[in-house]
Amino acid sequence: MSHGFTKEEVAEFQAAFNRFDKNKDGHISVEELGDVMKQLGKNLPEKDLKALISKLDTDGDGKISFEEFLTAIEKYKKGHRAGELRAVFNVLDQNGDGYITVDELKESLSKLGESLSQEELEDMIRVADVDQDGKVKYEEFVRLHVEN
């Protein structure tokens, strides 16, 4: 049930969930979500609140459990991480052709003050280069960062 979060993170999320769960039944209802949104200065119509809950409510009971709450946070974090990976890839892919080459990696690292040998640079590309074409495409770049 940890979703890859540390014990400390789960405890933090549980505390936040408990603040939303006013009646302490282990679920966030439409009414409780509405109260939270009002506290945040957003007075959403009930249909919008129900739509929001339905996006997170994986078991279809019309409420958000702590497990569903964690799943939503996990999806958000993964989406955020994917955006960060895309941004880094785009910086390394200096000519914008969708690939990182040894030369682009060398240029990028030298701008950061890193000086690696040609062999070290080629090894870095080789580790990520699943299809062995001598360059790293975005999917390979993501796989490298997800697996490590």
From Swiss-Prot:
SUPFAM superfamilies: EF-hand (SSF47473)
Keyword Acyltransferase tagged: no
Record: residues binding Ca(2+) 2: 57, 59, 61, 63, 68
Gene3D superfamilies noted in UniProt: EF-hand (1.10.238.10)
Keywords, alphabetical: Calcium, Metal-binding, Repeat
Chain sites annotated for binding Ca(2+) 3: 93, 95, 97, 99, 104
Annotated GO MF terms: calcium ion binding
Function: Implicated in the early stage of ectopic ossification.
Gene it is expressed from: Calm4
Chain ranges of the EF-hand domain: 8-43, 44-79, 80-115, 116-148
Protein name: Calmodulin-4
Source species: Mus musculus
GO BP: cellular response to leukemia inhibitory factor
Binding-site positions, Ca(2+) 1: 21, 23, 25, 27, 32
